[in-house]
From Swiss-Prot:
Residues 38-101 form the S4 RNA-binding domain. It comes from Archaeoglobus fulgidus (strain ATCC 49558 / DSM 4304 / JCM 9628 / NBRC 100126 / VC-16). Belongs to the eukaryotic ribosomal protein eS4 family. NCBIfam families: PRK04313.1. Gene3D superfamilies: 2.30.30.30, 2.40.50.740, RNA-binding S4 domain (3.10.290.10). GO terms for cellular component: cytosolic small ribosomal subunit. This is Small ribosomal subunit protein eS4.
């Protein structure tokens, strides 16, 4: 049997929701991001506090009042995750999904709602010999061999127009997106290729200490010659 809900106490640690209010929380539909994505209903009710109940949240969502990355989403289970931009036109407000100090997802109000940063996780050849870039949230766009896996690209949404290209290289500004250091920002100090089935390792130079983590947890957010991320990270 397919589980439509999951127990609130067993919800992913990225859910910043009360654990002892009620027994069940909505389970996200298959779609963008991974199992730690937030269902849109939970975001509207528990994070943005636009509704007191699930029924009220579903009504808001089904009325088309919530946009994710510039597109109206009416599925209350639609998965929302890192760097997604959630817009409420009636309130003239937009939020980017980021991390709080404990590595949990939190919506932070931003002005650059027309921009989203993507990590390139793979490249494939499609019909006509064109290169398709496979991005971290399941998005696919056509690109070129100038783009490498682990690089990031800045897109204008919802058009998916490329605005900038951020290379995965020493000195690049990065955010750690998994593990105990999720949400911390630093610069790539070194990159170690592991000659085994184990993941490659990246050492990130932080403000107070160096952090070594796996490459999957490293997301380029700024260029090596810049002191600022290319999007508003609320820091």
């Amino acid at each position: 049997m397919i589980e439509l809900h999951q127990k609130r106490l067993s919800a992913p640690k990225t859910y910043k929701i009360p654990r002892k209010v009620s027994k069940w929380v909505v389970k996200p539909s298959p779609g963008p991001h991974n199992k730690e994505a937030i269902p849109l209903l939970v975001l509207v009710r528990d994070f943005l506090e636009l509704a007191d109940t699930g029924r009220e949240a579903r009504r808001i969502i089904s009325a088309g009042e919530i946009l994710v990355d510039g597109v109206v989403r009416k599925d209350y289970k639609f998965p929302v995750g890192l760097f997604d931009v959630v817009t409420i036109p009636k309130l003239e407000k937009s939020y980017r999904i980021l991390f709080d100090e404990k590595g949990r997802y939190i919506p932070k109000e931003v002005e650059d709602a027309d921009l989203k940063l993507y990590k390139i996780t793979n490249k494939t050849l499609v019909r006509g010999g064109k290169v398709q870039l496979n991005l971290f949230d399941g998005t696919n766009i056509l690109g070129s061999n100038d783009y490498k896996t682990k690089d990031s690209i800045l897109l204008r949404i919802p058009e998916k127009e490329v605005v900038d290209h951020l290379k995965f290289e020493e000195g690049a500004l990065v955010m750690i997106t998994g593990g105990t250091h999720a949400g911390e920002i630093g610069r790539i100090k070194s990159y170690k290729i592991v000659r085994s089935s184990a993941p490659n390792l990246v050492t990130v130079e932080g403000e107070e200490r160096d952090i070594t983590t796996i490459e999957d947890y490293v997301f380029v957010v700024g260029k090596k010659d810049s002191d600022k991320p290319v999007i508003d990270l609320g820091v």
